[in-house]
Amino acid sequence: MNISYKWLLEYLPCTLSPQEIADTLTSIGLETGGVEEIETIRGGLRGLVIGHVLTCEEHPNSDHLHITTVDVGADAPLQIVCGAPNVAAGQKVVVATVGTTLYHGEEEFAIKKSKIRGVESFGMICSEVEIGVGSSNDGTIVLPSDAPVGMPAAEYYHVESDYCIEVDITPNRVDATSHYGVARDLAASLKRNGVPAELKLPEVNLPTDIIDSRIEVKVADATACPRYQGLVIRDITVGESPEWLRNRLQAIGLRPINNIVDITNYVLHEFGQPLHAFDLAFIKGDRVHVQTVAEGTPFVTLDGVERKLTAEDLMICDSNGDPMCVAGVFGGLHSGVTEKTTDIFLESANFNPTMVRRTARRLGLNTDSSFRFERGLDPERTDWALRRAASLILEIAGGHLGGMTDVYSNPLKPHLISLSFEKVNSVIGRTIEPEMVRSILNSLEIRISKEEDGVMTLEVPRYRTDVTRDVDVIEEIMRIYGYNQVELTGYIRASLGHETETDRRYKWQTVVSEQLVGAGFNEILNNSLTAGSYYEGLKSHPREMAVELMNPLSQELNCMRQTLLFGGLETLSHNLRRKHLSLYLFEWGKCYRFHAAKRTDETPLAAYAEDDRLGIWICGQRVHNSWAHPEEPTSVFELKAVVEQVLCRVGIETGAYTLKTADNDLYASAMEVKTRSGKLLGTFGTVSTELIKRFEIEQPVYFAELLWDALMSESARYKLEARDLPRFPEVKRDLALLLDKAVSFAEIESLARGCEKKLLRRVELFDVYEGKNLPAGKKSYAVSFFLRNDEKTLNDKQIEAIMAKIRTTLEQKLGAQLR
């Protein structure tokens, strides 16, 4: 949320700088994202002055340029070459002197001394669009004859500067979603620090001569709409807002529309209460009904989009039941205020947060009004906001005030909380004087209605929807008192619990994340929601096993993901289009599946399952072309190495798992990682060409998806040990094997480890050959076997016995032949 510095000072006059205010707000829990200086005209018209054109002659080398001399109040006139068709001697103009920076959209350019068609030019005579004071670019600005020569253009155009403070409001602090709300917290902090701070709310005085004009209001459900107020104003003039109002809205990033709409927006950001103005001519029967409508009713909102309503959407309707506005969310196209409007009905209401949130999400509308209503507003605050807006409308747009309607069926009682000074000190951890506690509570508008034996009975304002318990009040006291005022004691009390399984999993996630980042990977975070269309036609992840959303935000986000793959492909595609061609990514996330067969009336949730996974993507170049190394693309073998390193890091060593070819339609070719007992730990391989083409990716993508729950379960069976460096030498033996092309190295490694579990340390493939001089359907593998005994040096007899056993096994199981 954006806060204007000057606007804020209207409610809390103080001498703090914008940055000091931002720092203070952050210290009391209203964290600020930054402070930005803004001006009503970009650049503040610095370097521009009012000039008087003394002479204007045609350029000798051009048929459209003019050579002018312009008095800008300096020691001598400036010679300026100008291309505007309307420039003439005697005019008062706006001149950009040398060194001035002008802005056009996102572009900017500096005025320099130049030579145009052989004639020197020492500035520029400007048009409206060039300096940002209008939209005309047909010629130079011609000012009135009494415009003072040499006056800075910023002074002539009344350029104002301000500071925009970005405040990050947490969802529970709806009371701080306005300038007055922020000022209230700031005042409390200043008072706590001994700085005089008087919070001022503008007085509202409405005329007593009210015309006989009133709208009848009927609320169908007081729970859906606890309070609805409105009044009529006739004979208004809709037009442009005054400069001060436009400046206030522009300072916080809002676009002025017209004086009526601007006033409702102004009061919203001033006091936090949303308002809506209806064109009275479109309220049929002079009656407003707050109700729901029939399922499927079409409704065109202010943005011109037709939306289908449901029977749960709360609407503002006319006497015929025709919807005019989505309550608390968005107005209708045909009932809003236009330049032709002369009479209005001004609404200030309170709507049920749950209903507003549900409707706003379903319709895909996130407005300033819904943002506040969703968090819960105080029905008592509608009245002041309505009167304030009516007062401003009468002042700015004229008109005559009609009657007010107020439907408030069940006025809320004050929320009472009991709190002792003893508990305040106990929870905070230090003694705070009762007078300080009372002062802080008073500054937060929390009234002490009773105090007896050190126990206070507090009346909490209804707008503080987040303060419902005594500990919430203590948090408020602590927030204003200052967390940095509470020093650490000489001892720390804490409970040290045993490491839970959840703790263990998070610990290993951190360890593996650090390992991957150290290897050059970047962590990504994708949405758990995905497009159901991704799963159409897949056998490994069929569409019918997707968890569908009942009310999706869009068709691109209509189901929960079954695999991490597609989110990563979206990220890869996005970055590849921006010329980031070599990408190493990983992601932690949950995946979800629906098993219809497991669903019963007694256990409806048994059909749903979720599990944690680790996704790893590799794409692009492993080594870029340089003087030292030729270019080398990534490969599935690089991904395989990463997978093995992750498994090793969590304690699952090479011999504890097997790699087998997988039939998975996500991949062009893939391997499954399984335990010796056949439990699946993950899958990796080359992503299917058809899939990557759907994401407009034109280079191979290698993807691994590890089942983290299964990995953690398996790793718990092994104990990580720190070992001494081997004291005895390692022996290497090589075999050149002739094999069928279908045989994988993983099969060779697995069989070899089965032959010798104790002494065989590593199995490595160092050469592959396929081609001439080999029988059809055959290939040659050159494999190294590394043997070591940690207790003594191996002798030739032991080595040969092991190697003979390995050779025999490979011959019998794989049909291998020694070359």
From Swiss-Prot:
PROSITE patterns recorded: B5 (PS51483), FDX_ACB (PS51447), TRBD (PS50886)
Catalytic activity field: tRNA(Phe) + L-phenylalanine + ATP = L-phenylalanyl-tRNA(Phe) + AMP + diphosphate + H(+)
Record-annotated tRNA-binding domain positions: 42-154
Localization (cell): Cytoplasm
GO molecular function ontology, one term from the record: magnesium ion binding
EC nos: 6.1.1.20
Broad enzyme group: ligase
Superkingdom of the source species: Bacteria
Positions bound to Mg(2+): 466, 472, 475-476
Cofactor binding notes: Binds 2 magnesium ions per tetramer.
UniProt keyword list: Aminoacyl-tRNA synthetase, ATP-binding, Cytoplasm, Ligase, Magnesium, Metal-binding, Nucleotide-binding, Protein biosynthesis, RNA-binding, tRNA-binding
Domain B5: 412-488
Domain FDX-ACB as annotated: residue spans: 726-819
UniProt keyword Disulfide bond present: no
GO biological process: phenylalanyl-tRNA aminoacylation
Cofactor(s) for this UniProt protein: Mg(2+)
GO cellular component, one term: phenylalanine-tRNA ligase complex
Family: Belongs to the phenylalanyl-tRNA synthetase beta subunit family. Type 1 subfamily.
Quaternary state and interactors: Tetramer of two alpha and two beta subunits.
NCBIfam families: pheT_bact, YtpR
The protein's name in its UniProt record: Phenylalanine--tRNA ligase beta subunit
Species: Porphyromonas gingivalis (strain ATCC BAA-308 / W83)
